[in-house]
Amino acid sequence: MSLDNTVVVLKNNKNKHLAVLKDDQEFVTQNGVIKFNDIKELPSVITSSNNHEYHVYIPSFEEFILLMKRGPQIIYPKDIGSILIAGNINKNSNILEIGTGSGALTLYLNLILDKESQLFTLDESKRNQRRAQKLSLIHI
């Protein structure tokens, strides 16, 4: 899953889900089906097949991290700042991350790095390696 085509599907300010927008795809909820072809722009309010309204919008970085599928424990946004300060990490850093895990920290590091910076991330788990590749990170 990458941020490029990911949206939040929200009902009643309670039920939030991440979904990947693809033509001719549907998002199935307990309140009906949402057809992605019906979404013309973002943000948008769309009606499910059972006449329930959903808000569809591009997620904030924090929403993406908190709603993304997890394998291992994620590093929460509130902890990322402490890691950046302790590691003296800035946009010009070259980073070697040992233990990609869910990719939450990797994703944030990728977001802040300058184009000339490099981010190397290693994980012994093939599943975590595939998860990082799906995030479409540009510095890896």
Regions found by a protein language model. Give the residues of each.
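Conserved small/polar residues in nucleotide/adenosyl-binding loops
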Residues: 138-140
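Conserved SAM-binding motif I beta-strand of class I
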Residues: 118-123
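Conserved SAM-binding loop of SAM-dependent methyltransferases across substrates and taxa
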Residues: 102-114
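N-terminal auxiliary segments of SAM/dcSAM-dependent transferases
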Residues: 1-55
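Conserved class I S-adenosyl-L-methionine
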Residues: 92-101
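Conserved alpha-helix/loop element of class I SAM-dependent methyltransferases that forms part
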Residues: 77-91
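Conserved SAM-binding loop and adjacent beta-strand
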Residues: 67-80
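Conserved SAM-binding loop
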Residues: 132-133
